[in-house]
Structures are given as C-alpha cells and as structure tokens.
Design a protein with these regions (language model features):
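Beta-propeller-forming repeat regions
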Residues: 1-189
Length: 189
C-alpha cells in the first residue's frame, strides 16, 4: 500500500497497485514482490525511512528453503541487541530448519543502515560454504566449519554469552557473535 511505497524520505518504493500473489495466493520467489523494513516515529506513527528488506525471498528457490509453498522462506524473527556494546541494533532473521539469513541494522535518527548480512549454508564438509558475513564496507568473513544451517528454533534470544561487552544472538542451538559470524553451534538443531 501507499504507506509502504511512499514511506519516509524515500520518494517511491515499489508498485502499490500490483498483485504479487501467484495462482495459489502465495508470495514466492522473484515474482513475490518487494519487501521493506520501515522505521516509524513512535510518537506520531509517521514513516521515517524505508529500505529494502535483506535478504529478499528470491535469494533462494523454494526447494532450497526446504519446501515448495513458501513456509520456511517466510519465517522471520527479530531482536534488539547491543552489538557494539552501546547502541541498539535490530537483527532480522529469515528462514528456519535449513538456510538461515540474519541481518543487523542501525538507526542513527536519520538513516537506517545495514551493518552486516550473515548467510548460513551447510558446512563445507556437507557441501556448503558454512557462514559468510558481508559487511557494509564491502568486506566479508567466512567460516566453512560453523553455520546456523539446520540449527533453527521458533525464537531468538539476546545475551552477552562470551562476556566481551557485546550482545550475541542465540538462534536455537547456535550463537551468532556480535559481528555476524557463528560463535558456536552444536550441530543438533
């Protein structure tokens, strides 16, 4: 609707007249339409800024998510964490049971900025690349032996589990460190 496509300082985002549902009524893949993350003013309800949601549902085909009806690709969790130990960040996750993506965003009162995107595939020994984190400055880190893949749960928690002064994201039996890398996982889901 208009409240999303013309939110905040963005002039126009998307086509608010197009119906993106498929013949089964589902929003799937590249044809599933755009997705957004919006910051609203808590006092007035006015949209302050809208950005494209990362990762988009089209990042994987439905079969890679583990089903063909958009159930796992449309599973979202959110948390607020102090990833730098001082300022709040929002961490948004997409996916359960198989592929998992997590993105951290900061809000400085004017701009909503992505800090990092953590992509989690099977570990290298299982034919994947493990955990890859891309940062806003264009750099990246990769750990082929640790992953959130198949470690999901129906909740996400936040705590400073390694006592370093920065919050970590607890995702089922795995822990994402404050920089988006996998701190630990037990491989049992």
């Amino acid at each position: 609707g208009n409240y999303v496509s013309k939110a905040g300082k963005n002039i126009t985002k998307g086509d608010d007249t197009k119906d993106y549902r498929n013949s089964s009524g589902l929003l799937m893949g590249e044809d599933g339409g755009p997705e957004y993350l919006t910051v609203f003013n808590g006092e007035t309800g006015a949209a302050m800024q809208t950005v494209d949601f990362d990762p988009p549902r089209s990042i994987l085909t439905s079969s890679k998510w583990g089903d063909s009806y958009a159930n796992r690709s449309e599973r979202y969790l959110a948390a607020v964490a102090y990833l730098d130990g001082v300022h709040p960040s929002v961490v948004m996750t997409r996916g359960y049971y198989t592929y998992v993506y997590a993105a951290a965003y900061t809000w400085d009162g004017t701009d909503l900025k992505e800090q990092w995107l953590s992509t989690n595939t099977p570990t290298e020994e299982n034919g994947g690349t493990g955990c890859t984190v891309k940062y806003a400055d264009g750099t990246s880190k990769n750990n082929t032996n640790k992953t959130l893949y198949a470690q999901g749960a129906h909740s996400v928690s936040v705590a400073d589990v390694d006592n370093d002064g920065y919050d970590e994201i607890i995702f089922g039996s795995a822990v994402l460190d404050h920089d988006g890398t996998v701190l630990t996982y037990d491989g049992r889901g």
